[in-house]
């Protein structure tokens, strides 16, 4: 936004009782009495600063407040409505109430996949009930897992199908009262005796529940800290989940070696190639570890797209559960001997299906 654009912003009557940022609104009112600043030009540089519902003060104040998905800084030492023009020594003063066109307001608009509405009481209650159902069912089912564990180690030490059946039962009980899963492409799943590397986008804590409900005996990769959690950590250990210590290169190498060993023994493994949950619903870049394992062992890569879990339980809001349904798309297996090719093809399939 240059100086000419700044000067073209005209005063406008109040459309809203408080400042908002929404790509659905044609105009946005930014009011000085709320101490909101949209932009500043100084020394040829443009900076955007916003602060909602701040209390004005005569003294210097430096604050950091959240607007949408952006972190913004505000200082009351300078007039936020004064724009400096390099071509002219004088400054131009904006009106008290200003209106910004939608193309400028979109700069501070969060991604539409994960808006940040006010959390409803019903979502909080659903989140509490979800935790209660999952906790009670896990407490009872862990007993079956413990009883059967010696036999699993004796007869099925790598795939551990019995434990995965218990995990599927637990996940199905936990999510059944709260949301439905629509699955597409079940015919693309390899047989239970065919090892494969499964990869998926990662949006929410609910991704694990959703994937366990598929009933496939694949081994997840999980942070070592989760293994110490009672019941959940015990179940993960008995299922053969592969531990990984983040930011530890040696642990990463050991993790990949363990995955290759499992694949050679007939078990499947599951990776979230993004490495973490997405905070805005967008697909991040893929790490190549999963595809290196597939290329070296010669097994297929099965891409899976998850949609809807991030809206039901957004990242960072694990205590709430919104209404909604989940869509799972299982893509055709990908074969190849080059990790780069496998990585690009798998990501392309997931990205294309997310744009539908």
Curated annotation (Swiss-Prot):
Matches recorded under InterPro entries: AGP_acyltrans (IPR004552), Plipid/glycerol_acylTrfase (IPR002123)
Any one GO CC term of the record: chloroplast envelope
Compartment(s) where it occurs, according to its Swiss-Prot or TrEMBL record: Plastid, Chloroplast membrane
Mutation effect (residue 230 to L): In lpat1-4; suppression of the sensitivity of fab1 mutant plants to low temperature
Position of sequence motif HXXXXD motif: 202-207
Catalytic reactions of this protein: a fatty acyl-[ACP] + a 1-acyl-sn-glycero-3-phosphate = a 1,2-diacyl-sn-glycero-3-phosphate + holo-[ACP]; a 1-acyl-sn-glycero-3-phosphate + an acyl-CoA = a 1,2-diacyl-sn-glycero-3-phosphate + CoA
An annotated Gene Ontology molecular function: 1-acylglycerol-3-phosphate O-acyltransferase activity
Tissues with expression: Widely expressed. Expressed at higher level in leaves. Expressed at lower level in silique walls compared to leaves.
Protein name listed in UniProt: 1-acyl-sn-glycerol-3-phosphate acyltransferase LPAT1, chloroplastic
């Amino acid at each position: 936004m240059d100086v000419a654009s700044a000067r073209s912003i005209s005063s406008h009557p109040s459309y809203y009782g408080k400042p908002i940022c929404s790509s659905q609104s044609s105009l946005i009112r930014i009011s000085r009495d709320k101490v909101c600043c949209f932009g500043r030009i100084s020394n040829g540089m443009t900076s955007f600063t916003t602060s909602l519902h701040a209390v004005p003060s005569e003294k210097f104040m430096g604050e950091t407040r959240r607007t949408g998905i952006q972190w913004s800084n505000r200082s009351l030492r300078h007039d936020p409505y004064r724009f400096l023009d390099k071509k002219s020594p004088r400054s131009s003063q904006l009106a008290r109430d200003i209106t910004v066109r939608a193309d400028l307001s979109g700069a501070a608009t969060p991604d539409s996949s994960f808006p940040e509405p006010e959390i409803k009481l019903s979502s909080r209650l659903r989140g509490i009930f979800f935790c209660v159902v999952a906790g009670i069912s896990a407490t009872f089912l862990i007993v079956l897992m413990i009883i059967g564990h010696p036999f699993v180690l004796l007869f099925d030490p790598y795939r551990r199908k019995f434990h995965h059946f218990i995990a599927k039962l637990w996940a199905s009980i936990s999510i059944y009262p709260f949301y439905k899963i629509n699955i597409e492409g079940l015919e693309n799943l390899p047989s239970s005796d065919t090892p494969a590397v499964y990869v998926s986008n990662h949006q929410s804590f609910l991704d694990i529940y959703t994937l366990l409900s598929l009933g496939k005996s694949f081994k997840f990769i999980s942070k070592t800290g989760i293994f110490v959690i009672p019941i959940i950590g015990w179940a993960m250990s008995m299922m053969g989940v592969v531990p990984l210590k983040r930011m530890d290169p040696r642990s990463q190498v050991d993790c990949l070696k363990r995955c290759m060993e499992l694949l050679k023994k007939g078990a499947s493994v599951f990776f979230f190639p993004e490495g973490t949950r997405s905070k805005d619903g967008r697909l991040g870049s893929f790490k190549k570890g999963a595809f290196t394992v597939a290329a070296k062992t010669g097994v297929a890569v099965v891409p899976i797209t998850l949609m809807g879990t991030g809206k039901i339980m957004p990242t960072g809001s694990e205590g709430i559960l919104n209404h909604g349904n989940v869509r799972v798309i299982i893509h055709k297996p990908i074969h190849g001997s080059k990790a780069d090719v496998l990585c690009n093809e798998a990501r392309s399939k997931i990205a294309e299906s997310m744009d539908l």
